[in-house]
Amino acid sequence: MIRRNFIKTSGIILGSTFYLPSILASKNLNSRLNIGLIGVGGRGIQNWKPIIRTENIVAMCDVDDRWAYNALNEIKQLHPNVKKFKDYRVMFDKMKNSLDAVIISTPYHTHFHAAITAMELGLHVCIEKPVAHNVWEC
């Protein structure tokens, strides 16, 4: 065996032992993400409307019943099994195993708390700036 071929073959085998498990365990690139929405009114509308047809909305949360009701009616047309919550902490408790990511569209001073909770659960977070209300939260 030529040394160059040995090194090349060894590199391919070694690389595949690390690379293949990540491919097999990952989601299909064509599969939809399971999204949770935190804050569905006001600016939140502009954050969830673009993805309503491309991703699975599995949970939504808003403290304002008017916004939640309007959003729920629209989201349920495409995602009839979406769950509605008033408190994002309850949503995380009940839905954490069903979520891949959350979109946080709450007032600025509440971004940090919802985002850090989601990240601690291993969820991906989509959030607008500012992420934190003050420097001590960063």
Q: Could you describe each region identified by the protein language model?
A:
Residues 13-78:
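N-terminal Rossmann-like dinucleotide-binding module
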Residues 7, 49, 72, 89-92, ...:
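Non-transmembrane alpha-helical segments in soluble domains
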Residues 1-14:
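N-terminal secretory signal peptides and thylakoid transit peptides that target proteins
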